[in-house]
Amino acid sequence: MRIVLALALALAGLAARAQGNEVPGWFAESFLEFPQDVKEAAGEGKRLMLYFWQDGCPACRKLKETTLAERAIVDQTRAYFVPVALDVHGEREVQWTDGRTMREKELARELNVRGTPTLLFLDDKGAVLLRRVGYVAPERFVATLAEARRR
């Protein structure tokens, strides 16, 4: 009986975590090896857009459900950027653009991610060229994409 109860609680926790995920389904899947991701994106004429989020973040949820749900924004983002999501409390292993390996949460600290959502746009060498923190309304998001493309 204890095993069944423990399994039920574990499954309930996984379901709750999945519902709390503030990442759009159209974001790229990545092995989080950013030297390779930057190179591949550049080969396609794109740049990386890193999206730092956390479960239970109201601004992350609003960004996902409004701005990142607009078809024109999805299309424009995917045309010029490769969006990759990172959990500020995450344990996944990441290889940063300088070759160092760390956990998602350590990378967030390294990049001074202090609030969520945080969007970081990288140039074709992997350097951060633009940062946006907090909810970004659709009009401002479009302007942000244009600015990141110009830099």
Annotate the PLM regions.
Residues 44-57, 83:
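Short active-site neighborhood of thiol/selenol oxidoreductases, capturing the structured segment around
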Residues 1-7:
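Sec-dependent signal peptide recognition
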Residues 109-151:
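Non-catalytic, surface beta->alpha helical segment in thiol-disulfide oxidoreductase systems
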Residues 60-78:
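Typically the conserved alpha-helix immediately C-terminal to a functionally engaged Cys/Sec
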